[in-house]
């Protein structure tokens, strides 16, 4: 086992093998950069026609997300497919956790047949909601999905 000391802002071993340590650091940095770019490839947030989505252009899927600048309101019809900024058609397959949570001005929503799951607290506190069209394709309802809607 080697002893390391800190000198002149460089970590160097007592036997003077500074280059092996630098090589190790470079290897770790390269591995982290490769892993992070592979994970992020094709996955991005976009606002399309007033809806915020998490798009996976590789899988050609989209999840409707909560808005970051206010709430959804009125009568809403969610499209079955959306086109990403780079031209990829993505099927809307899910509503994320809290997608419409707290949207008291939301009165009705039509969910497309491409959607298979509604996340936790998806419509929580949507007190103005009077009509929801849920297709048979939806097989998963998150916990508290319609909590405090009446």
Predicted segments with their positions:
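Bacterial N-terminal signal peptides
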Residues: 16, 23-35
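Consensus positions within tandem repeat domains that build extended binding/scaffold surfaces
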Residues: 97-99, 119-122, 142-147
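Non-globular, low-complexity intrinsically disordered regions
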Residues: 63-65
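Boundary at the C-terminal end of the N-terminal hydrophobic targeting segment
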Residues: 38-45
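N-terminal secretory signal peptides that target proteins for export/translocation
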Residues: 1-19
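Structural signature of tandem-repeat unit edges
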Residues: 57-58, 71-94, 103-117, 127-140, ...
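Short, ordered beta-strand-loop transition motifs
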Residues: 47-61
């Amino acid at each position: 086992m080697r002893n390391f000391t800190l000198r002149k802002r460089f970590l160097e071993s007592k036997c003077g093998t500074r280059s092996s340590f630098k090589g190790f650091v470079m290897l770790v940095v390269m591995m982290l950069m490769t892993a992070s770019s592979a994970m992020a490839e094709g996955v991005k947030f976009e606002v399309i026609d007033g809806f915020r989505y998490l798009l996976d252009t590789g899988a050609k899927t989209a999840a409707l997300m909560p808005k970051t600048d206010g709430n959804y309101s009125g009568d809403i019809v969610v499209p079955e497919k959306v086109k990403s900024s780079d031209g990829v058609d993505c099927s809307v397959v899910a509503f994320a956790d809290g997608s419409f949570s707290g949207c008291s001005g939301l009165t009705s929503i039509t969910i497309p047949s491409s959607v298979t799951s509604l996340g936790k607290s998806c419509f929580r506190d949507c007190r103005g909601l009077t009509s929801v069209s849920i297709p048979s394709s939806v097989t998963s309802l998150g916990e508290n999905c319609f909590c405090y809607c009446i």
